Every structure is written in structure tokens, then in C-alpha cells.
Amino acid sequence: MRTTYIAKPGEVERKWYVVDAKDVPMGRLASAVASILRGKNKPTFTPHVDTGDYVIVINAAQVKLTGKKASQKMYYRHSNYPGGLKQRTAGDFLAKEPEKLLETAIKGMLPHNSLGHKQGLKLHVYAGEDHKHAAQNPEVLDITNLI
């Protein structure tokens, strides 16, 4: 009898990838990175097992916002106090916290459950070129052929 392969958590081999976000549209980058974090690029992908790889995103401050998103796209948060609604544009968000902007976009494309949270922990975003994961020997991934 033939059965579908189901990955087991102990059998998963993980790689480390470095992705350069310079001049790449934010949504397309986020979609490709989320797919790698989930493991959908592997033939052993199993929906209920974390089969994804680690991803390091560098140059987050130079990611491209297309159209008028820098001035018109709004991000909201609330302090749970009356009148505590805070809002800012994507351009302000990119100028002040580029790492958090990209993390928000990528994690929004992961499952919203405990498995998605575990997959999100394998994401590391840096505003500049430097990162502290050289010991893992990350492989440079050209994202332009994935988008």
C-alpha cells in the first residue's frame, strides 16, 4: 500500500538563508520569505509540521514600497485605553523601524496559530548589511527568481 509521506519533527533538516531586501517590493519579498519559513519549497512539506528553514533578511531599510503606499498605507495599534488609537504611515514605519515593518508583513502571511508562531521565530530581520549569524554559514538566496 502506498501512503503519503508525513515529515516528523525530528527528521527535518534545516538550512539558513540570507535574503537581500534592497529594492525588492515588500509584499513580494514577504510572500517568498513566508513560503521558505513554512517549508513549502521542499518536497517534504507537511502542513502540520514545521518543515521550514531559517531566513535572515538584510537591508530591510531599503525595501521598496510601490505606488503611494509610503504615504497612504496606514498601520494601527491600540493601547486599550480610551482614545489610545495610534496610527502611522508605512513611510514613517519604514523610516523609524524597518525591521518591524518587514516582520509584520512576513508574519502576517504565516498561519495564525501556534505552528505559525514557531515558524515566525526562525525569521531574523536587520536594517543594514550586518547580521550576527555568520557562524551558521547561511546560503545567499536570490529572491528575484522566486517572486
Swiss-Prot record:
Gene3D superfamilies: Ribosomal protein L13 (3.90.1180.10). GO terms for biological process: negative regulation of translation; translation. The keyword Transmembrane helix does not apply. One of its GO terms (cellular component) is cytosolic large ribosomal subunit. Pfam families: Ribosomal_L13. Keywords: Ribonucleoprotein, Ribosomal protein. GO terms for molecular function: mRNA binding; structural constituent of ribosome. Belongs to the universal ribosomal protein uL13 family. HAMAP family: Ribosomal_uL13. This protein is one of the early assembly proteins of the 50S ribosomal subunit, although it is not seen to bind rRNA by itself. It is important during the early stages of 50S assembly. Part of the 50S ribosomal subunit. NCBIfam families: rplM_bact. This is Large ribosomal subunit protein uL13. It comes from Limosilactobacillus reuteri (strain DSM 20016) (Lactobacillus reuteri). The gene is rplM.
